[in-house]
Amino acid sequence: MEQLLHYVWKHKIFPLKELKTTTGQQVEVIDTGLANTNAGPDFFNAKLKLDGVLWVGNIEIHEKSSDWYKHGHDTDPGYHSVILHIASQIDTEIKGSNGERIPQMQLSCPESVYANYKELLETDSYPPCYRIIPSVSSFTLHSWMSALQIERFEQKAALLSERLKRCQGNWEDAFFITLARNFGFGLNGDAFEAWAHRIPLRAVDKHRNDLFQIEAIFFGQAGILEDFDGDDYYLRLKKEYAYLQHKFELVPMDASQWRFLRLRPTNFPHVRIAQLACLYHRAYGLLSRLMETETLQEVRDILKGGTSAYWLTHYTFGGSSPSRPKTLSKSSLDLLIINTVVTFLYAYGLHKGSEVLCARAGSFLEELKAENNYITRMWEQCGMKAGNAADSQALIQLKKEYCDKKKCLYCRIGYEYLKRK
């Protein structure tokens, strides 16, 4: 209920006239203030008139006024600047840390808002607001989508920042781990990330001119060179890895982490590892090259990949198959660009203070085709069709950060739903 009161106050969903404090002072709301999601009062820099006198300060909201004491605000100097305490139930007077009484106002949630909110939380339909989406103005939807796009950029940049810290600020290492994870295309994402942490790029750099040696490191660290028997290529890789393992003190991962169930052969870990080995053999300074690209085609040309000759006729070690190039499909390339390259362009742009790189990240998304997955298909059924990858990223953000977490109070579509009569 307290969150709902925050919502009612923020959006002024209450009678603006005849508002009074518990002691009878007339209240005129000029500005409800800026919502605070961190520690401290709920709204900063609100502007009110109490009996015609202008007050500027903070607002605190509780379900019961006694919660003020329950939460220890009476002894916290951080709440000294509260000019009005709002509660749906007034059960006691309150005082600040300086001992002065703080004005209070009783505020109830309108019945229609409460009923709509309860409906959103309890409905079995998904998303619960689907009925009203067709009636929401295009301006509201477009502005909300734009905000979600930026929010997703910022969220991904924050996650990348944490990864960078774990990589001691090394952008190349962070990029390799991110790229490898996304090469898992969902099912093997965790396994590829664990594998990438075991790949010493400095060792790879020393053998970059020899694709066979890079493959030996990559496959060996994946834990899939442990069998005693195999074809000639497998046995040569195994022997080469034994030498490199001793040279660089390498410790392989447990091969049981890899998943094969329900995977198409082109998505088998062996094929993806072979593609990554070829990519790092061909593209020296991969991250720098990608950050310098100006067109999507340049990015695709760098990432399009390929494999050594052995993998033209194999999906795993052993049994052969008809010869077929193992290059990344356009849809797979685009997913790697969306989830890896664009993210790094934006984050690196922030790091360098480069508006050009940040803008390029946005323009790449707008140029890329919208993702086709269960989330985008669900929104399309509700009347929200993604026109490009920027839109599909926004819709993914909407589902994961608002719908799944029931944060309807913070969603602009939820706002339209709640204000219905």
Question: Where does each model-flagged region fall?
Answer:
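A broadly used, surface-exposed interaction patch
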Residues: 42, 46-93, 98
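Compact, glycine/acidic-enriched structural inserts
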Residues: 80-82, 86-144
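Cysteine-cluster motifs in flexible loop/terminal segments that predominantly coordinate metals
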Residues: 393-421
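N-terminal "leader" segments that precede or initiate the main folded domain
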Residues: 1-6
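N-terminal ordered "arm"
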Residues: 7-66
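Short loop/turn segments at secondary-structure transitions that flank enzyme active sites
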Residues: 65-67, 90-92, 111-113, 185, ...
